[in-house]
Amino acid sequence: LGDVYKRQSLYTADITRTFPTNGKFTDFQKKLYQAVLDSQQAGFEAAKPGATYSDIHHACMRVIAERLHDWGILPVDVEESLSPEGQQHRRWLACGVAHHLGLDVHDCAQARYESYQNAKIRPGMIFTIEPGLYFREDDLLIPPEYRGIGIRIEDDVLMTEDGPEWISAGIPKRIDDVEAWMADMAAEGVKA
């Protein structure tokens, strides 16, 4: 997992990619990676002028909870997990899934909840969408094949009048594209 940022003319970018160290995802890794990618896409689809960070967060979390349930990991049904009293899915994704970008990588991270999580997203705002799944090595409540795996996909988004635009779209994130990128780097002698 590589989480990198770039500062240009005082402004920042923040992007994360997860790579298979040998250049190819296993079928099991593909399943987990695709869940995170689908979660990110759900967050992107929820992002529109007038939406809130909470809307993006809930869209991403629904996909994560659904997949964890499908895999038999979530100890309750999806709706119970997504309820304010539940949140069992947060065991494997404990952080938020979006933040402002600007002069700081986590711009406005100290803002009050009502003026950040529930504030309306307006055209001109730039933010990330970055869901993930993190399975601890010592988590005995999950099957062994999940343990020690962490996946996050983070991209930068510009909100326009017409909706969101990926501004980090040039960096591969689809499974086939990541594997092709890894193969290109290996051919150039770059090691993962």
Annotate the PLM regions:
Residues G2-A192:
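Active-site neighborhoods and metal-handling regions in enzymes and metal-associated proteins
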